[in-house]
Every structure is written in structure tokens, then in C-alpha cells.
């Protein structure tokens, strides 16, 4: 039968593995942080597609605005010319 104390002591191999794990974690912690920051920046950054869509939408609105006023003014000019012909 084993003693109660024997459960608390760890094998030297396990202690060594734990030490290596701690050192490895300390080394990779800045790398993990940098990777997380990169992923977050990529996730929140506005992409080229979004910028292109916004520019296309603005251009379409300006074109519609211009077409509306062009057609509205051109019909007024045509009606004025018809009145002058009489």
C-alpha cells in the first residue's frame, strides 16, 4: 500500500515537462497576441469591395440627381420654345 504523501510528489519527468510548457508558453505569448491583433484588424478593416460599393452608390445617386434635373429642365425649355413659335 502506498502512503498518502506519495500522491503529492510528482515524477521528475512530469516536473520537467511542466517547466518546458511554461517556458514555451512564455515564448509564444507575444506571438499569439500579435496574431490576435492581426486577425482583429483584418476583421474590422474596410475592404476594397466595400469602398467600391460605396463609391458606386454615390455615383449612382449623383447620376440619378443629374438625370432628374436634366429631364425636368429640358421639358421646360421645350414647352417655352413651343409657345414662342406661335
Swiss-Prot record:
<feature type="transmembrane region" description="Helical">
    <location>
        <begin position="51"/>
        <end position="71"/>
    </location>
</feature>
<dbReference type="GO" id="GO:0005789">
    <property type="term" value="C:endoplasmic reticulum membrane"/>
</dbReference>
<comment type="similarity">
    <text>Belongs to the TRIQK family.</text>
</comment>
<dbReference type="InterPro" id="IPR024842">
    <property type="entry name" value="TRIQK"/>
</dbReference>
<protein>
    <recommendedName>
        <fullName>Triple QxxK/R motif-containing protein</fullName>
    </recommendedName>
</protein>
<keyword id="KW-0812">Transmembrane</keyword>
<dbReference type="Pfam" id="PF15168">
    <property type="entry name" value="TRIQK"/>
</dbReference>
<comment type="function">
    <text>May play a role in cell growth and maintenance of cell morphology.</text>
</comment>
<keyword id="KW-0256">Endoplasmic reticulum</keyword>
<keyword id="KW-0472">Membrane</keyword>
<keyword id="KW-1133">Transmembrane helix</keyword>
